Amino acid sequence: MSFKVPRGTQDILPGQSEKWQKVEAIIRDICRVYRYNEIRTPIFEQTDLFARGVGETTDVVQKEMYTFEDRGGRSLTLRPENTAGVVRAYVEHKMFGAPDQPVKLSYLGPMFRYERQQAGRYRQFVQFGVEAIGSADPAIDAEVIALAMDVYESAGLKDLKLVINSLGDKETRDTHRTALLQHFEPHIHEFCSDCQNRLQKNPLRILDCKVDREHPLMKTAPALTEFLTEESAAYFAQVKSYLDTLGITYVVDPNLVRGLDYYNHTTFEIMSTASGFGAITTLCGGGRYNGLVQEIGGPDVPGIGFALSIERLLLALEAEGVELDTASGLDVYIIAMGEDAKQKAVELTSTFRAKGLATEMDYLDRKMKAQMKSADRLGAKYTIVLGETELEEQAAAVKHMESGEQHKVAFSELVNYLSQQS
């Protein structure tokens, strides 16, 4: 019997994993300069957390969650997203009492959704996201958007489009809800069963329908921006003003609602405009969620965040032809000829590694030519050849692989010599 990875998952092999590490390093450095501290939450949570936090009418909750009962009869779910989990941790650990607000958090880890597999979308996928909880200042909205843009631009992407919208406050959404009901209700039988279920629970979700997106009523649906209260309109204007100050280009799309129920006020997506990217262009999505903390059992504290898929980021890099610098960083490859030389190679390998020098040696007792080819394939900066002569002289032949220059260096001076050259 042969085994393969489960449908919708993938193995990330050497050669690819270095690209992941490079992207992750870029992300961690950006979080450092923006001061978003990492939080690590469980990969499974109580199922009710997502039903309450993400929204019972969303596709995520109704169709895409991996839910199971543990041996104690508790319903648990592999996290389909991480905002709800981070907010749960924020409430549970009373982070709202921290002296410095807002609390700025970042996360990076696997999420799970039962989705149809397609390019850049998996049932287990890695998501990076940030949450800024504790401020309703439009400037923090702009900061969160700027951070997301920085991730893509620092990775080397250029073909990007930022789309923003405002979902307004509760009064805005209540008025808009009434208008949507009047618009869709007479013709709701023409829509899919999901939309029919959403009509009374959350008609805004109809605008996010993937089945009936081309229905004529979708194009004539009342835009939420037409119902913004004076306060909501002023807030959105400030967000746009801060983005202008930061030199960030954006497009306002009044139909952008996102697929999760907790959003209000600012919502945004970053898309790839690369010609080879494919049909699904969204790379990142986020927005403000001023009622979520209270919904999950905490105080009335505002928040904003986003999440992006690492898989889709890598796909966008490929579409634009961007090559990440993933050099192996191998400092030394030791070539040993004979058992005595191999004993010395083992000793030197350990010594070099202890001094922070990335070192490799041969473990197949191959001929010198084969070992030299391995050193070249691995991108070694230096090779050290050990044989009978070198052992007798207590000195090694050190070759700089790029220039071809070769020097004889005493064993006792090898660490100093290599450290100075690296």
Swiss-Prot record:
It comes from the Bacteria. It catalyses: tRNA(His) + L-histidine + ATP = L-histidyl-tRNA(His) + AMP + diphosphate + H(+). GO terms for cellular component: cytoplasm. The keyword Nucleotide-binding applies. PROSITE patterns: AA_TRNA_LIGASE_II (PS50862). The keyword ATP-binding applies. Its main location: cytoplasm. It is found in: Cytoplasm. Signal peptide: none annotated. One of its GO terms (molecular function) is catalytic activity, acting on a protein. Its EC number is 6.1.1.21. One of its GO terms (biological process) is histidyl-tRNA aminoacylation. Keywords: Aminoacyl-tRNA synthetase, ATP-binding, Cytoplasm, Ligase, Nucleotide-binding, Protein biosynthesis. Homodimer. Belongs to the class-II aminoacyl-tRNA synthetase family. This is Histidine--tRNA ligase. The gene is hisS.
